[in-house]
Amino acid sequence: MSTENTLSVADLARENVRNLVPYQSARRLGGNGDVWLNANEFPTAVEFQLTQQTLNRYPECQPKAVIENYAQYAGVKPEQVLVSRGADEGIELVIRAFCEPGKDAILYCPPTYGMYSVSAETIGVERRTVPALENWQLDLQGISDNLDGTKVVFVCSPNNPTGQLINPQDLRTLLELTRGKAIVVADEAYIEFCPQATLTGWLVEYPHLVILRTLSKAFALAGLRCGFTLANEEVINLLLKVIAPYPLSTPVADIAAQALSPQGINAMRDRVAQTVQERQYLVNALQQTACVEHVFDSETNYILARFTASSNVFKSLWDQGIILRDQNKQPSLSGCLRITVGTRQENQRVIDALRAEPV
């Protein structure tokens, strides 16, 4: 048998996958730390007891208790809620449902969350970027100039990694610009830290608005992998066509329903209050630390700061077991590190380590 045209397994893969640089999640980047402040997780574990013992049966595609509890919490109808394996799956579902590979494009505004780009690339959909303005708000003219052929626009508010809210009037302008042309996805992964800024009340006005949510941040359930997509029923029905038949395991659905009970939501709000208090403590301390050039305002559970020698600071803390998130390679974030708000003890360790840095 001739082997002249034999391809390696890698050669058999799609070209865009061979060339793909995967998203560098906090866990992929690794480290041997004992102070993990690089993934915007809640710093302490929350305990739940499993109540469902039907693991011999397949779960519901969209568990009723989870959907109803989340709809009540978010102030929308159950028909406007889809639950998935984290908000990351929601990103992928929207692209798969609305974008033709090789024809349509997505658009996002760096510096922002990296999975919009990676998800589009794996599916073979063009990625367009319109960098944010100097104040990290939307460049509406730039977006308008790039809408031809764009099917989905991703906006993260509060934005990761910068921490600020997108101007609501700019969001309205964007929704008007895209009406009848493109889907606008508002990523609200951190909205529990500034609930007054949610766009859920806008769903009735904008049939092309999609909102992403998660239990990974304020609900302290990053290990659960449970996220939500909020949209009008027509959009949800389209997403249900492309979602896996059993996206949530029975234990995940069980814990999610408990987390979204009245007691669970009250506990989440207590965690938010605790995080906001610790965030202010960390901001004040960073502002009085010599190696810190600037601390940016935050509406989230993390702080972005610019350092005089960020690479040295990052490595020095890494070597001490304090793992931060390096944002140097993001557009306009030269010298910046992102610090998750931890416990008081963790925050103090960060400050002590930073104040020991040479300037």
From Swiss-Prot:
UniProt cross-references to PROSITE patterns, sorted A to Z: AA_TRANSFER_CLASS_2
One biological process term in Gene Ontology: L-histidine biosynthetic process
Stored InterPro entries: Aminotrans_II_pyridoxalP_BS, Aminotransferase_I/II_large, HisP_aminotrans, PyrdxlP-dep_Trfase, PyrdxlP-dep_Trfase_major, PyrdxlP-dep_Trfase_small
Needed cofactors: pyridoxal 5'-phosphate
SUPFAM superfamilies: PLP-dependent transferases
Reactions the enzyme catalyzes: L-histidinol phosphate + 2-oxoglutarate = 3-(imidazol-4-yl)-2-oxopropyl phosphate + L-glutamate
Protein's pathway: Amino-acid biosynthesis; L-histidine biosynthesis; L-histidine from 5-phospho-alpha-D-ribose 1-diphosphate: step 7/9
GO molecular function annotation: histidinol-phosphate transaminase activity; pyridoxal phosphate binding
Positions carrying N6-(pyridoxal phosphate)lysine: 217
Enzyme Commission code(s) on record: 2.6.1.9
Broad class of enzyme this protein falls into: transferase
Gene3D superfamilies, sorted: Aspartate Aminotransferase, domain 1, Type I PLP-dependent aspartate aminotransferase-like (Major domain)
Keyword set, alphabetical order: Amino-acid biosynthesis, Aminotransferase, Histidine biosynthesis, Pyridoxal phosphate, Transferase
Subunit organization: Homodimer.
NCBIfam families: hisC (TIGR01141)
Family affiliation: Belongs to the class-II pyridoxal-phosphate-dependent aminotransferase family. Histidinol-phosphate aminotransferase subfamily.
Protein name: Histidinol-phosphate aminotransferase
